[in-house]
Amino acid sequence: ANDGRNHLFLQPDGRYDVIISEPPNPWLTGVSNLFTREFWALGKRKLKPGGVWGQWVQMYGMDHEDLRTLLRTFTETYKHVLLFSTIEDADLVLVGSDSPLDLTADRIGEMMNRDAAVAKDLADVDCETPEDVLTRYLVAQDKILQFVEGAELNTDDNMRIEYSAPRHLHEDTADENFAKLLKGAEVRDTVPLETVKDVPGMIDLAEAYTRRDDYLKALLVLKAAAELEPDNEVIFERYPIYQRKLREQLEDLEEDEGTTEDDDGTTE
């Protein structure tokens, strides 16, 4: 038996089109060295020109400084980086390459149509259309770089994450990590409008956001579409529906925040 790092080390440079790394938690001994600068640099050498590395990163069980460290280490490795969320926003997926990443609905659709296995795997996580995939997009590289500025790198020599992250193992850090990651980013920064080429595509993207109950982003996309086609009947019909859904969400949120439960089960 051998481990993944040594297996990759033994492969010839430039062998792979895509490498996906989803090891267990990054603080585990024997796993932590799959999240270091040296390992990601090794992986980059094994990719073909234009190859892509996909990296799972968790949002829970470590604080935002640990998250900043992991993201900065990855962005130090790859010139082009995109960031996506997973189911229920519990984790992140980093996508890195030395070539520009072609993130468009058409390109995603081509890959889904070309490989039925890929389409099935995506459908298993509620991504049945290219637009569903795009709703997982979080931020582009410029926002990532703002978030990680000044963060310490995770290296084979310091193993920072292995020794730091366990201190937050039993803390609920996911929501705070998401908030700090997106701090300073406008909602527009988290919506990939440039990935759809026309108004019908924008309408499809808006509808995909509603499947995630994200009516704020759906409205933002429809508003941008309306600027291009102000007389579009579909936009005219759906905009007030999405507005009503968003108001209902906000009202429910206010109601939840206004109700507290005491230890004896009473509310006030």
Predicted stretch roles:
Residues 236-268:
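Terminal, low-structured helical/coil segments at or just beyond the last alpha-helical repeat
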Residues 3-10, 32, 61, 83-239, ...:
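Soluble small-group transferase modules, centered on the S-adenosyl donor enzyme superfamily
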Residues 1-71, 75-77, 195, 211, ...:
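The AdoMet/dcAdoMet-binding core of the Class I SAM-like
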Residues 43-44, 48, 68-72, 99, ...:
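Short alpha-helical interface elements
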